[in-house]
């Protein structure tokens, strides 16, 4: 399970990095050891990280707070929030970052 989780989570973090690395020049993005930090021009910081013990990806957002995402392979093949099954990791990141740039 952990090997499969790490492969899926790493792929997702790579996708997030690729999406936002060239997204807007107002963003500063760092990707180090399974952690992504995205800082907006007005100093809002988003942190996305792999949490291996729980098999989750965690998001710390200055807008909506903390989210824990689990992989939903049954329906959407995406990472959904444990707080609200309608929240997907890429969707919430795009929405919140767009509101800051």
What is the predicted role of each segment?
Residues 1-101:
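N-terminal intrinsically disordered, cationic/polar leader segments
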